[in-house]
Amino acid sequence: NDPIYIQFGRFVSDLANGDFGDSLRKQRPAIDVVLEAIPVTLSLAAVAMSIALLGAILIGSLAAYKPNGVFDRISRVVSLTAASAPDFWVAITAILIFSVSLRWLPTSGIGGFPYWIMPIGILVIRPLGLLVQVVRGSMITALSSDFVKTARAKGVKEKSVIFKHGLRNGLLPVITVAGDQAAAIANGAVIVETIFGWPGIGKLMIDSILQRDFAVVQASILITAIVILSINIIIDIAYAVLDPRIRHK
């Protein structure tokens, strides 16, 4: 019966002490319920982000080596299509094709390697498509710069030109975009975990909303925000380490 501002002040005070309240559904501290689900989401997101980043560097660099070539044109069409594909539509389509029709992969649940293929594949598609475009543009700019032309004029091997000079400088803009895509993967995990029945923080959040378990919902949102904020801080530090101009400023 206390006024709203008193209830809010009490909530903030409890929050500062790490008390998110108790889960109505599980009759346990909400923070414990959320912390149990975080490793599943982090493992899924980490694998997806690693594949997207490494794949984008490889495909984008190959496309930038010969701009407007056959590989470049194909990669642009495929990457633009991938970047535009909604996660929920791709997930449902993948289930219909690979689980229902072909019976190659399990429909839902968590287990061995086959259970990881579709969830990770869905999370990889959009970030991979966007990062390929960014890597391609950055590498084209880097490979046409004066220091690369000078290195080639001095007879430096092409492999060294691409990886030592081009790739190192061309990846700087990719770092910022990769941070945004890491946050996007965390958001996409909510959809993917719900569709494929993965017991991560995304599915936990949706289940808690449907069951009106508001303590778990609040804890899930705050923990997710902290993780995304931490990712952005790490990206800023990495950018400063790799780019001396930022450190000097």
Placement of each model-derived feature along the sequence:
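Alpha-helical transmembrane segments of integral membrane proteins
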Residues: 34-71, 100, 110-249
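Alpha-helical transmembrane segments and their lipid-water interface positions
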Residues: 17, 90-91, 140
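Short, hydrophobic secondary-structure boundary micro-motifs
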Residues: 5-9, 21-24, 90-91, 106-108, ...
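Membrane-water interface segments at the C-terminal ends of transmembrane alpha-helices
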Residues: 10-13, 77-107, 122-126, 133
